[in-house]
Swiss-Prot record:
Gene: rnfD
Claim: Plastid is one of the keywords in the record: no
Pfam families: NQR2_RnfD_RnfE
TM segment ranges: 20-40, 42-62, 83-105, 120-140, 212-232, 236-256, 263-283, 291-311, 319-339
Domain of life, source organism: Bacteria
Name of protein: Ion-translocating oxidoreductase complex subunit D
Annotated function: Part of a membrane-bound complex that couples electron transfer with translocation of ions across the membrane.
InterPro entries per UniProt: NqrB/RnfD, RnfD_bac
Length: 349
């Protein structure tokens, strides 16, 4: 019998970095399938393009740094970043925007700080925020799937939009009901809350399409909730961050909702709109950019939930997931410094 030599401490760990990243990517499949069902095959094509470009950027950086490409490339960290970017951005973005986002996510946010384990900001959220600030019109265009198209025609149309032509390239867009239908439920509610009358009262088609998009986001969030429960069951992520984030969002949204149901969304609406569930289980739980302590993880989730509530209600951005996560990433070193625990047998300071 051949014995395996091990160093102290003798603690078995069933999950390495590669397996953790693989399980997280696997848990994204329900959300990916749901987005494809509601928004078309452009989601899949765009996600694959994000993956290919991200891996190419990583290969270039590893070559420049003379690192082992096989070990670094197949830890699935950049693969996961690309998948999260593909799922969080509207489908049919132009190819050059995808390259722009991947450059900031992989080169700037990850390898400029030293690579995996050294970055202080979530790479996927950096890539998302860069697109949101630079191209806000494209980032709010969530078009529903054309049910009249076949599977082949849907793929062909998506490839043409991404690689050759994009209908949003026109700098001048007229304000019409067709533009309104591209809004997410959070966009829709924020627009209507500024008016005392019904926006486009006679446009029944607009209301119908807006309702379809609202239903789509509910099922998308439920799909990510299922994937998140799988990660909790496999003990890949810690329960403290999702629980504290969702509890904070429910608490603050309940206060404003009971104050005025006309101008503020209900807690249930906040939970199943935008990227709430994706943030709770897939983005905020990034082990590199979150706090190392148990109490720090709770504060981390509470801060994100509070900031999401603030941005959704009082800013021009309909969803504040990315900005909230990045701001919380900034204060993680401060939390780890003041919330660190002492060693065994010593009193906490």
């Amino acid at each position: 019998m051949k014995l395996k030599k091990m160093n102290l401490p003798y603690i078995s760990n069933t999950y390495d970095v590669r397996k953790i990243m693989f399980l997280v990517v696997l848990s994204c499949i329900p959300g990916l399938c749901t987005e494809i069902y509601f928004f078309g095959c452009g989601v899949l094509i765009q996600t694959l393009l994000f993956v290919i470009i991200s891996l190419l950027f990583e290969i270039i950086i590893l070559k420049m740094r003379r690192k082992n490409i096989k070990n670094s490339l197949f830890d699935y960290s950049s693969f996961l970043t690309a998948v999260l970017l593909g799922l969080s951005t509207p489908c049919a973005l132009p190819w050059w925007m995808i390259i722009f986002s991947c450059f900031f996510a992989i080169v700037i946010s990850k390898y400029l700080y030293g690579g995996l384990g050294q970055n202080i900001f979530n790479p996927a959220m950096i890539g998302y925020v860069v697109l949101l600030i630079s191209f806000p019109v494209h980032m709010t265009a969530w078009n529903e799937k054309n049910s009249s198209l076949s599977f082949y025609n849907d793929i062909k149309k998506s490839i043409n939009l991404i690689l050759f032509y994009n209908k949003l390239n026109n700098s001048k867009k007229k304000i019409c009901p067709d533009n309104f239908t591209e809004a997410t439920p959070l966009d829709d509610f924020k627009t209507k809350s500024h008016f005392d009358y019904d926006f486009f009262p006679e446009e029944s088609a607009v209301k119908k399409k807006t309702k379809i998009v609202s239903i789509a986001w509910k099922y998308i969030n439920i799909s990510f909730l299922i994937g998140g429960c799988f990660l909790l069951y496999k003990k890949v992520i810690c329960w403290r961050i999702p629980l504290s984030f969702l509890s904070s969002l429910i608490f603050f949204s309940s206060i404003t909702y009971f104050y005025s149901q006309k101008f503020f969304c209900s807690p249930l609406f906040h939970l199943f709109s935008g990227g709430t569930m994706m943030c709770a289980f897939f983005i905020a739980t990034d082990p590199v950019t979150t706090s190392c302590t148990k109490i720090g993880k709770i504060f981390f989730g509470l801060i994100i939930g509070f900031l999401v509530w603030i941005i959704r209600n009082y800013s021009d951005y309909p969803d504040g997931i990315a900005f909230s996560v990045l701001f919380a990433n900034m204060i993680v070193p401060l939390m780890d410094a003041y919330l660190k625990t002492s060693g065994y047998g010593h009193k906490n300071l």
